[in-house]
From Swiss-Prot:
Domain of life: Bacteria
This protein's UniProt keywords: Amino-acid biosynthesis, ATP-binding, Cytoplasm, Glycosyltransferase, Histidine biosynthesis, Nucleotide-binding, Transferase
Entry text on domains: Lacks the C-terminal regulatory region which is replaced by HisZ.
Record Pfam families: HisG
Family, as annotated: Belongs to the ATP phosphoribosyltransferase family. Short subfamily.
Signal sequence segment: none
NCBIfam families documented for this protein: hisG
Subunit-level organization: Heteromultimer composed of HisG and HisZ subunits.
Gene Ontology MF terms in the entry: ATP binding; ATP phosphoribosyltransferase activity
Name of encoding gene: hisG
Pathway annotation from the record: Amino-acid biosynthesis; L-histidine biosynthesis; L-histidine from 5-phospho-alpha-D-ribose 1-diphosphate: step 1/9
Full protein name: ATP phosphoribosyltransferase
Subcellular location: Cytoplasm
Length: 214
């Protein structure tokens, strides 16, 4: 049995064509079903639906053989015990620093001000600001980052930005790009050794589908 870990939403939707290229189709819609283990048209493949932040953990410990996870999640996780053979080029966005429209970010940096930053990407943010020689206080939140600067909790946010619409709606502006984000295929290293004959065709089909879309 091959187990593939996925999260609901955009990643699942954009992974569906890749699964189809490998001859795999979910028999139930995760948005409509309460089931967390979904059968597929192949008796030897099942999908498990987990939180996006948990995908690397399920794969790392062998509860899943394969998974699809964003670079943002993998960077925070650290990627221990995971083989990352392929950038799937899906669920693309950017990790950005954003502030209120009236906040002088560049001036604050020049003055050496100690900024307060809200984010759920604490590890990535810490490494980014340290590389710039900036002193910041990081405050971890799990959602609604945009609210932080508006109510005085923080001077800036570090978050994922797709179109920038949410920032504009909350009178925020992006001032710095940290990294491009896309989703990656991750593989349990032990599974790759023990189940290579089963996993390699799936990995190859994903790679061919990604190449065809570029």
């Amino acid at each position: 049995m091959i187990t593939i870990a996925l999260s609901k939403g955009r990643i699942f939707e954009e992974t569906t064509p890749l699964l189809a290229a490998a001859g795999i189709t979910a028999l139930e819609d995760p948005e409509a079903s309460r089931k967390l283990i979904l059968p597929t048209n192949r008796s030897d493949v099942r999908l498990i639906i987990v939180r996006a932040t948990d995908v690397p953990t399920y794969v790392q410990y062998g509860a899943a053989d394969l998974g699809i996870a964003g670079k943002d999640v993998l960077d925070e996780h650290g990627g221990e015990g995971l083989y990352q053979p392929l950038d799937l080029n899906i669920a693309r966005c950017r990790m950005m620093v954003a502030v209120r429209e009236d906040f002088d970010y560049v001036g604050s940096i020049r003055r050496g001000a100690r900024l307060k930053v809200v984010t759920k990407y604490v590890k990535t943010a810490r490494e980014h600001f340290a590389a710039k020689g900036m002193h910041v206080d990081l405050i971890k939140l799990y959602g609604s980052m945009e609210l932080g600067p508006l109510v005085g909790l923080a001077d800036a946010i570090v978050d994922l930005v797709s179109t920038g619409g949410t920032l504009r709606a909350n009178n925020l502006k992006a001032v710095e790009e940290i990294t491009d984000i896309s989703s990656r295929l991750v593989v349990n290293q032990a599974s790759l050794k023990l189940k290579r004959d089963q996993l390699q065709p799936i990995m190859d089909a994903f790679a061919q589908a990604v190449a065809a879309n570029q």
